[in-house]
Amino acid sequence: GKGRTDYLLCVKVEAVPKSLPVAVLEAKRESEDPLKGMQQAKGYADCRRHDVKYVFATNGHRYGEFDKFTGLQGGPFPFPDFPNHPDLTARYAGDTGIDVHTPEAAILFMADSPAYPESRYYQDAAIRAAFEKIINCRKRGDTAHVLLSMATGSGKTIIAANLLWRLHEAECLPTPALFLCDRDELREQAYTRLKAVFGDNARIVETRNGKNAAQNARIHIATYQTLGLDDEAEEVASFLTKHYAEDAFSVIIIDECHRSAWGKWSEVLKRNPNAIHIGLTATPRQLRESKQRTAEDVEITANNIKYFGDPVYEYTLIQAQEDGYLAACEIVRRKPSIDWKTFTSEQVLAAGAVDARTGRPITAEDLTKDEYSAPSFDDKLMLPERVKAMCGDLFEQLCKNGGPEQKVIVFCNREIHADRVAMQLNNLYVKWCREKDRTPKEHYAFKCMGGKNNGADMIVPLRGSGQRAFVACTVDLLEAGVDIERLNAVVFFRYLQSPIKFYQMLGRGSRIYEETGKYKFWLYDYTGVTELFGTDFITRPPRPKPDKP
């Protein structure tokens, strides 16, 4: 559990605070063959998971080994021939090209920050993998571009904080570092984490009295909107160019780099060509190839790989759940009976459909096709009876699995759809309270969209206690990055074709919350989105047959 292994074998350099793991040693019973269980696939997996180069197994008399670089297994060998510390140090240097005694390698041996001193094994492995690439890029005279693929909820911001701290301690931050994200909520979360490490030397980039409030800080935290990276073409990067010279940063970390890095905010990378560029993503590289995978997903993945290279370290949702760091996911597949049929244009009119974008009743002139199927519902057409049926079934499921007063996100197709879903769920909740002789709590279900007075202010109480703000009905405001540890359920009333979006949305429920005993979350799928799961994931749990509400 939790990624533990029998032993980690480390290289130690005198007068440095931290050791460098280079191998895993599996201890076996004396009576067992030391090569038992040392399949090639397992060797590769152990090396990847711990970012080590070798795997050894021994029964105390003989040993076997797996070498990541050659892909070969060896043994059994007599135990007296087992490599000692100088042997492993020399072998690591020869295979990686990194001499651990040089100043360039110092970052590998720096301790984590006092704010986050006990990294989880995969967080430490991710930082080591990033540093190894940075060291080798610098040796070649290349700019270091590093990609880390970490499951949502695995602590990407803590990884960033400790990575920057270790660079700082190794005197590798000659100029400030920039942490760049695309939403205010992510900026505030990053600021909280980075301030815990760097204190007042971590500042949010904003205008104050006509000046950059972060100008004297070591760590600058910004959204690309603040830097002016979403300006019109003639004013691209207005704040960036006004307040920052070229090559102003020594390190740039781009959070959720799969979302927008290839739009205008790539300007910040171009203006800092000599900085270390680090991309953080929660999107798994291996997505199921299917007709549902969108052209946009293909382009995003290709762009990430082209710019950053392959991820130097990957920590998947499955691995995090197996390790016990993220909540398990219980899938409930539902499908409204209305979705099994195809509607003629006459039936659409008879059902009282409304325009999903404007809310006005559909007329015959609006219907350009002879037939309409489920994916058209709620994105283009909204059938009031369908919304009512789905909300009724969801409320019944919530009552059955923990009660209605639990924290839930419902992903809807459009804003009007979110409005109608919130209204239906509120009505159902009021009726439930009346039947139970209970006083309804405030803001049970609410629309949560971007913009002022449009529900975004309810994110704080949604995160908070169980006294109000239970069900957030949104389109995509909460799809990524916002930490809601109390979240008990993620609901899809929305049709999706993008695995990237699906994984982001799913990740909202994956955090464990020990205070309420939350170690799993529910995924209610009303639109077949779980078909976007990677094949390795959908083997656990078994796929239930869909029920018809």
Enumerate the language-model features and the residues they cover:
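ATP-dependent helicase/translocase motor core
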Residues: G1-P176, C181, E185-D200, Q215-I219, ...
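Conserved RecA-like P-loop NTPase helicase motor core
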Residues: K53, Q225-T226, V251, Y444-P546
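Long, largely alpha-helical accessory region at the distal end of helicase-like NTP-driven motors
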Residues: D112-Y116, P375-D379, A389, V529-P549
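Conserved helix-turn-beta segment of the N-terminal RecA-like "Helicase ATP-binding" lobe
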Residues: D184-R208, Q424-C433
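Conserved ATPase-coupling elements of RecA-like P-loop NTPase cores
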Residues: A190, D230-E234, C257-E267, S290, ...
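Conserved C-terminal RecA-like helicase domain
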Residues: R218, K369-T474
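SF2 helicase catalytic motif II
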Residues: L240-G279, T283
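Interdomain helical connector at the RecA1-RecA2 junction of SF1/SF2 helicase-like NTPases
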Residues: K291-Q406
